[in-house]
Amino acid sequence: RVLRDAGFDMDLDGADSFSIQYQNANNSVRVSDEFMQAVVDDADWSLVGVVTGQVIKTMKARDMWRQIAEAAWECADPGLQFDSTINRWHTAATTDRINGSNPCSEYMHIDNSACNLASINLLKYLDADGTFDVDAYRHTVEVVFTAQEILVGRADYPTEPIAENSRRFRQLGLGYANLGALLM
């Protein structure tokens, strides 16, 4: 309501909506070693349709790299995923290649897999005197990680292949939130 009352066009096809439609998206571009070499060599690079495999457009790799860099500088997107490196460092390389990630790219694995993610709010461990309660934090890590491990076996997944791979590989991700606020 506030934006509408301030005169913004709230129509879904309106100019104002168009300018913010991707603000909550997290976009990445996946590049290979061959693409990076084409950037160095200022060579042509073909954009290929994922479904059809047909060349859609050919352009200078260096020009595309500049567009990616400028877009990232302007709005922090796209992120970059280095496909060749990702698959070289694959922790289950004998299974299949890694084709994608979750939106924030902290989880990369084979198709039809999932990672149970959780975060711990670091500010909850900041005592009144400004010290960090390491013992309580360690205890929380142990409890949450154990809970995540239990959840893998008890969770429902959208498809049977995702359920099978989740239970087979048991990927877990435990992170933290509010590091910046904690340090301030």
Q: Residues of each region from the PLM?
A:
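Active-site cavity-forming subdomains of large catalytic enzyme subunits
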Residues: 1-139, 153-165
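Generic alpha-helical secondary structure signal
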Residues: 112, 116-117, 139, 143-146, ...
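Core structural elements
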Residues: 145-151, 165-184
